[in-house]
Design a protein with these regions (language model features):
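Beta-strand-rich structural segments
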Residues: 96-109, 163, 219-231
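Residue-level recognition of secondary-structure-to-loop junctions
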Residues: 141, 148-155, 280-281, 292
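Sec-dependent bacterial lipoprotein signal peptides
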Residues: 1-28
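Surface-exposed interaction/gating patches
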Residues: 189-258, 274-289, 293-294, 299
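Beta-sandwich strand segments
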Residues: 110-114, 170-179, 232-236, 298-302
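Aromatic sugar-binding surface patches on proteins
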Residues: 133, 143-148, 267-275
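N-terminal low-complexity, Pro/Thr-rich disordered segments
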Residues: 14, 28-80, 184-196
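N-terminal edge beta-strand
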Residues: 70-96, 198-218
Length: 308
C-alpha cells in the first residue's frame, strides 16, 4: 500500500511539466441517491453515492482535498506499520453483504483515531477485477475499531476492497493511506470487457464531456463539463466538501488513484465545469468513476481513460 505527506505531493505537482499523451474516454453510468455508491450491475456503469464540483483554479494549497493525497498504488494490505485486516475472505453474491475490517498500527493494536478527509474518517471502495461493480461507501466504526461496510449486491468473481484513511495520532499522524485486500464472491463469473474509449456520455439525461491530457507519473489538469438538454448545468450540489468525486482504477491490477477537485464549494450552484488535479502513476487504461449530485440525487459516470 502507500502513504505520503501532503508536502511531497505539492512539490511533485509543482514540478510536473511536459507534453501529454492522448486522452480517450468512455463514459457510461446510471444514477441513484444515497451516501454510498453501489454498482450491482456488471456493465461498467455504476449506481451512485452523493457528489459534486465546480471550476476555477486556485493555488495547490487552496484546492479542496489537496491536503490529502497519497503516493503508491494501493495494492498492499500493509504500509509503514499499518495493516488492513479482515476475516472476510468470501462474500455472498446477489444480495447485500456486510464486510468487516480493522486497521491495526503499533503492536498490531486496532487504530480508532482517524482524521476527517472530505468530511469522512474512512472512505471504502469495492471493485471487481474487470473494473465493474464499483462501490464507494462510508462505513461505520465500532468502539473496538472494527469497521463495517454494507455492500450492495455483488456479482461472482474476484473483488478488491480499499480503505482510504488518515490517522490522527501515532507514527502515521497526518499521512494518507490506501490499503487493500481481495475477497472472493463464489459463483459463475463472467468477465465484462472494458468499453471502447469516447469523450462524452449520457448519464441520467446529463451529458458529461471530459477534456485533458494526463501523462503517466505527471501532474496535469483534467476538466469535466456537465450539461443537460444542451444547456450548461449550474446546480450541482456539494458532496464530500466538493462538487464532484473522482476515483480511478488501473486495468489489469486495479491500481488505485483519487483525482482531487481544484475548486471550492460555494453553495448549490456548482458547474458546469469541474476541474481536477490528475496524477495517474501508470500508463495504460484507467476506469474513472465520477460522482456528482443534483436535486438530492447522485449520478455516477464510468469513464475509460487511456494514459500514455
Amino acid at each position: 500500500m502507500f502513504a505520503s505527506s501532503r508536502f511531497a505531493v505539492r512539490r511533485r505537482a509543482l514540478a510536473a511539466v511536459g507534453t501529454a499523451a492522448a486522452l480517450a474516454l468512455t463514459l457510461a453510468a446510471c444514477g441513484s441517491s444515497g451516501d454510498s455508491s453501489p454498482m450491482p450491475d456488471m456493465d461498467h456503469g455504476t449506481k451512485p453515492s452523493a457528489s459534486s464540483s465546480q471550476s476555477a483554479s486556485p493555488s495547490m494549497g487552496d484546492m479542496p482535498g489537496m491536503d490529502h493525497m497519497s503516493d503508491g498504488n494501493g495494492l498492499s494490505d500493509t504500509q509503514d506499520g499499518y495493516r488492513l485486516t479482515s476475516k472476510d475472505t468470501t462474500l455472498p453474491s446477489g444480495r447485500q453483504a456486510a464486510y468487516r475490517f480493522t486497521v491495526t498500527g503499533t503492536g498490531d493494536k486496532p487504530v480508532t483515531g482517524f482524521a476527517l478527509d472530505q468530511t469522512k474518517r474512512m472512505h471504502f471502495y469495492a471493485i471487481r477485477s474487470d473494473l465493474t461493480g464499483f462501490q464507494h461507501i462510508h462505513p461505520t466504526m465500532a468502539p473496538d475499531g472494527t469497521w463495517t461496510a454494507d455492500l450492495t449486491s455483488l456479482a461472482p468473481g474476484s473483488w478488491r476492497t480499499f480503505a482510504s484513511f488518515t490517522p490522527d495520532s501515532g507514527t502515521g499522524k497526518g499521512k494518507d493511506f490506501v490499503l487493500s485486500r481481495t475477497v472472493t464472491v463464489p459463483g459463475n463469473a463472467t468477465k465484462t470487457p472494458l468499453p471502447a474509449p469516447a469523450t462524452t456520455a449520457e448519464v441520467d439525461g446529463y451529458t458529461v464531456t471530459v477534456k485533458g491530457e494526463p501523462m503517466a507519473g505527471m501532474a496535469h489538469p483534467l476538466s469535466v463539463s456537465v450539461s443537460k438538454d444542451g444547456k450548461p448545468v449550474t446546480d450541482l450540489q456539494p458532496y464530500l466538501d466538493t462538487y464532484a468525486h473522482l476515483t480511478a482504477f488501473h486495468e489489469g491490477d486495479q491500481e488505485f488513484a483519487h483525482l482531487h477537485p481544484t475548486t471550492k464549494v460555494t453553495g448549490d450552484n456548482g458547474g458546469p465545469d469541474l476541474a481536477f488535479h490528475a496524477e495517474l502513476p501508470t500508463a495504460g487504461s484507467w476506469r474513472l468513476f465520477l460522482q456528482f449530485r443534483t436535486g438530492g440525487k447522485l449520478h455516477t459516470a464510468a469513464l475509460t481513460l487511456h494514459v500514455g
